[in-house]
Amino acid sequence: MICSPQNNTGVIMKKRNFSAEFKRESAQLVVDQNYTVADAASAMDVGLSTMTRWVKQLRDERQGKTPKASPITPEQIEIRELRKKLQRIEMENEILKKATVDSIGQRNSYVKTWGCGGFLNETNIYSRGKSLCF
């Protein structure tokens, strides 16, 4: 745990980490069950500003806004994971595209090789764009 500055009593307080589920349930007290922010913060033993931030984030996420912080609603968590997966796949795709470019910057094209009815072999791949069709 990361230690934060001392509180009024001189005791060093540790930074608490809360799960997305805890944050969501705490904010739902205000949004869904009509607690005041102060009452919900007191009931869940968190700071007033923390509870205010969670409530705002829950409302924003329910309106479809992408959170800047870690998402707390299941839908936004899934969206974040899908975006990460898409980004990873796009990066892998870019790597594969770059791998098909040979040392002189020419693409080794499967379409060109098969376009003249030839077979994909080493001669066709390294022909450097020369037509091997007879």
UniProtKB/Swiss-Prot annotation:
Alphabetized, the UniProt keywords read: DNA recombination, DNA-binding, Transposable element, Transposition
Supply one GO molecular-function term.
transposase activity
**Gene transcribed to yield this protein:** insN1
Keyword check for Protease: no
| Example GO BP | DNA transposition
Cysteine pairings via disulfide bonds? none
Family as reported in the entry's similarity comment:
Belongs to the transposase 8 family.
What name is this protein filed under? Putative transposase InsN for insertion sequence element IS911A
Pfam family membership, one: HTH_Tnp_1
Function per UniProt: Involved in the transposition of the insertion sequence IS911.
Q: Which InterPro entries match?
A: Homeodomain-like_sf (IPR009057), RD_transcriptional_regulator (IPR051839), Transposase_8 (IPR002514)
